[in-house]
Amino acid sequence: MAQFELSPRRLMQMEQGLAALETSPIGAHAFAFFSPDEVASLIKAAQKLPYRRAKSSAGNNVSQDFDICFPAPRERQFDACADLLERAFAHCLEQQPDLFDAAIELNDFAVQLYPKGSTGIGIHRDAKRYRNIVCVITLAGMSDFFISADRDGQGRVDIDDSPGNLLLLAAPGFRGLADPALRPLHGVDNIAAGRLSIGFRMG
């Protein structure tokens, strides 16, 4: 299969993934979606990007220990990846017109690079301005992405965002998120072997 091809199998994976997200009590769901060759091509593209150090604290005193490229250029492999996701979401929206409150346009793109031993990013919610769906794709490394019930980390649930998986988070406008205030609290820690991840959002 060509890289980032929208195959019938992928459409089924996305349909099932969004159905699982809609019924998830934690507002997050991850599932296998990308091939090793696709992940490798994204890693290669990410290695060419310019990074800057993220602020050590953001929002509600959320700790941050990583380098970031933002806004990252949606070009080449990144654009092919985003286009694949947009077309898959469009298919699902066509089947279920009330799934999202608008067609998905992934116009907010960031790449994050966590060094080995990083403290990660503290528990936080994505900003309200991000609509419908948040896509996180880990490309390399060993770390823990988790959802928690509160900012103290109670009720923690680790999510398998291994390279090749697509992690979806519910955002305002998604049918499965009844209350925008209940956007999932999440964070990243236990950066045992570094972490390289990309995030697509609809701003």
Spans of model-derived segments:
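Non-heme Fe(II)/2-oxoglutarate
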Residues: 4-99
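A short, structural micro-pattern
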Residues: 6, 105, 131, 139, ...
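A general structural signal for short secondary-structure junctions and capping/turn motifs
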Residues: 20-22, 101, 127, 136, ...
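Short, well-ordered beta-strand micro-motif
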Residues: 30-32, 138, 168, 199
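A broadly conserved detector of short glycine/acidic/proline-rich loop/turn motifs that flank catalytic sites
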Residues: 33-38, 115, 127, 141-143, ...
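Conserved double-stranded beta-helix
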Residues: 62-144
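Catalytic core of Fe(II)/2-oxoglutarate
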Residues: 146-203
